C-alpha cells in the first residue's frame, strides 16, 4: 500500500489538471507561452502518474483495469474482475 500522503498529492495534482485544463488549451492555441509558464507546475498533465486504484502503487499499472499487476492477479484469481479468467491451452 502506498503512503497516504503520496496518494493525496497525486489526487491534488489531478484536481489542478482539471481546473486549468481549459485555460491551458486556450493559451496553447494562442501561442501565449509566457502566461502558460506562469501557471502552477502541477497543472500540467505530464506530471500525473497512473496509480493503482486498489493499492496506490505507481509502477506496473495496467491501463485497461487501472490496477497494478499484483492487485490484478489477486482479483483475477478470485474472479472479481468480470470477463477475465486464467488462460490454459
Swiss-Prot record:
A molecular function GO annotation: structural constituent of ribosome
Tagged with keyword Ribosomal protein: yes
This protein's UniProt keywords: Ribonucleoprotein, Ribosomal protein, RNA-binding, rRNA-binding
GO cellular component: cytoplasm; small ribosomal subunit
Gene Ontology biological process: translation
PROSITE patterns recorded: RIBOSOMAL_S14
InterPro entries, alphabetized: Ribosomal_uS14, Ribosomal_uS14_bac/plastid, Ribosomal_uS14_CS, Ribosomal_uS14_sf
SUBUNIT field: Part of the 30S ribosomal subunit. Contacts proteins S3 and S10.
Protein family: Belongs to the universal ribosomal protein uS14 family.
Protein's job: Binds 16S rRNA, required for the assembly of 30S particles and may also be responsible for determining the conformation of the 16S rRNA at the A site.
Protein name per the record: Small ribosomal subunit protein uS14A
Organism, as annotated: Staphylococcus aureus (strain MRSA252)
